[in-house]
Amino acid sequence: MLIAQRPTLVEDPISEFRSRFVIEPLEPGFGYTLGNSLRRTLLSSIPGASVTSIRIDGVLHEFSTVPGVKEDVTDLILNLKELVVSSDNDEPTVMYLRKQGPGEVTAADIAPPAGVEVHSPELRLATLNDKGKLEIELTVERGRGYVSAAQNKQAGQEIGRIPIDSIYSPVLKVTYKVEATRVEQRTDFDRLIVDVETKPSISPRDAMASAGKTLVGLFGLAQELNAEAEGVDIGPSAADAALAADLALPIEEMDLTVRSYNCLKREGIHTIGELVSRSEADLLDIRNFGQKSIDEVKTKLGAMGLQLKDSPPGFDPRQAVDTYGTDSYNPAFSDPSDDGAEFVETEQY
């Protein structure tokens, strides 16, 4: 079995909606393979939301004008194409814009329903004079990529409904480059740098995660042809390797009190991995292993970033009965001659 070093992915935020992602080290050639796939997926396949059609009060078609409005309908449509929205609704959703002049009309004047959010409230849509009045019904749908107005036009749609081009993609720009990087004595490994800029409706981090999920699903189709086919296995991450090392440690490394240590040993628990596979209820079933011992174990595990099976997160060691550091604290290996000296089988907490 061939095992490659696991690459790391690090995000370097440049601004709120632009980040640079560095993936390294990659086997020679994989930088361009991943970079091209990620770029194409980010630009074309990230789900988003957009306005698909509008209906303006008193307007029958897109070549009309609206009394009291400086912009004609064509200009209004061009401005609405710049609107940045997000939607949690799978079905088409309607939102409304109603404004009386004089003054400017911006995206902040739109009243979105529940599940829809306007992310570009400062976008200028139109200008009204003293007698100007604008009422627009906007239909928002979810999708991906680009859909033309002709494709958005539905058979038998109502008179006055104007379909518009929809740009669903929340990603504005993606570039990548591949550099050489060194691993031990080899200098031909790849470092992939992907620069992602998005609209305010999604963060670059979420866009990158979405692209990765899509690619994993698609490449998984090839793996299904033969699940046992040999490939290059990716080694464990540094965090996984450190966790595996901690789990393999003997419980002697926890520096427990004599009573807790002896109880665990008699139960056949020899490593930290075996210990964290037990729940509090399992440990309380051990004879002479009471709540003080539970608190001690949880405190020691918490210092290592671990916890017992099914334990709720957020254990506060200060809530435990604090006997550590006092005269009654007796680490199991502080003095071998005292091992078990104070351990009484029948004593209960």
Curated annotation (Swiss-Prot):
One of its GO terms (cellular component) is DNA-directed RNA polymerase complex. It holds the Pfam family RNA_pol_A_CTD. Residues 308-349 are annotated as: Disordered. SUPFAM superfamilies: C-terminal domain of RNA polymerase alpha subunit, Insert subdomain of RNA polymerase alpha subunit, RBP11-like subunits of RNA polymerase. One of its GO terms (biological process) is DNA-templated transcription. Residues 1-226 are annotated as: Alpha N-terminal domain (alpha-NTD). The keyword Nucleotidyltransferase applies. It is an enzyme of class 2 (transferase). SMART domains: RPOLD (SM00662). InterPro entries: DNA-dir_RNA_pol_insert (IPR011262), DNA-dir_RNA_pol_RpoA/D/Rpb3 (IPR011263), DNA-dir_RpoA (IPR011773), RBP11-like (IPR036603), RNAP_asu_C (IPR011260), RNApol_insert_sf (IPR036643). The keyword Transferase applies. Gene3D superfamilies: 5' to 3' exonuclease, C-terminal subdomain, DNA-directed RNA polymerase, insert domain, RNA polymerase, RBP11-like subunit. Residues 336-349 have a biased composition (Acidic residues). Its EC number is 2.7.7.6. Residues 241-349 are annotated as: Alpha C-terminal domain (alpha-CTD). DNA-dependent RNA polymerase catalyzes the transcription of DNA into RNA using the four ribonucleoside triphosphates as substrates. Belongs to the RNA polymerase alpha chain family. NCBIfam families: PRK05182.1-2, PRK05182.1-4, PRK05182.2-5, rpoA. This is DNA-directed RNA polymerase subunit alpha. It comes from Frankia alni (strain DSM 45986 / CECT 9034 / ACN14a).
